[in-house]
Amino acid sequence: MSSQTLVAAGSLEEAIKEALVSSPKKRRFTQSVEMIVTLRDVDVKKPENRLNTVVALPHPAPGKLAKVAVIASGDTALKAKEAGADIVVDKDELQKIGNDKKAAKKLAKRYDFFLAQPDLMPLVGRVLGKYLGPRGKMPQPIPPNVALDALIERFRRSVRIRMKDEPQIACRIGVETQPVEHLAENARAVLAEILKKFPPPNIDRIYFKLTMGRPVKVSREVVRK
């Protein structure tokens, strides 16, 4: 089922507009627009009911692109640098990081997505697994013969949607300066991905809020149970 059949046309836009208008006075920084989806009748204690996936947004926020780290050696590392990866970590550097707990934590915190050369995945797991795993950031293996520049660009414009211990999913869909229509399209992309995992009866409520604003609920009348 698509997000369009779950939520009536225009309802997301209306809730986003209200969230923008009801936010406190202008801040000295550009506030993020966050989407919160609460679920019902989902047992989060069961691993199969948890969600950790990536959604490419149709309209990524200007100046808020995700940071992508590539772990690779040789030709793949060279291509990753040419493709503009935010950082490229080769095998030797990875092993050094493994002996530096502070550096490993910093790497895991600073970058949003990790891509790794397939033959380095076991080493990545041993060296960085305990730092990336709890954050839901374990690397994606780089497919053979992939256009690395396109792959990196896709992750740059993506957000991670993750549900762990609570039946709730929250992610940033943009910033307050973006057009409402763009924010709504981003929200629909996220909702469509959630619906691949959880059918409409499991969708309880949808909210939007700014960083410093109050949550605004999408009208219940348009969320079809």
Curated annotation (Swiss-Prot):
Swiss-Prot/TrEMBL keywords: Repressor, Ribonucleoprotein, Ribosomal protein, RNA-binding, rRNA-binding, Translation regulation, tRNA-binding
Transmembrane segments: none
Alphabetical GO biological process terms: regulation of translation; translation
Gene Ontology cellular-component annotations: large ribosomal subunit
PROSITE patterns: RIBOSOMAL_L1
MF annotations from Gene Ontology: rRNA binding; structural constituent of ribosome; tRNA binding
PANTHER family: 54S RIBOSOMAL PROTEIN L1, MITOCHONDRIAL (PTHR36427), LARGE RIBOSOMAL SUBUNIT PROTEIN UL1M (PTHR36427:SF3)
Record family assignment: Belongs to the universal ribosomal protein uL1 family.
Function description: Binds directly to 23S rRNA. Probably involved in E site tRNA release. Protein L1 is also a translational repressor protein, it controls the translation of its operon by binding to its mRNA.
Descriptive protein name: Large ribosomal subunit protein uL1
Organism in which the protein naturally occurs: Thermofilum pendens (strain DSM 2475 / Hrk 5)
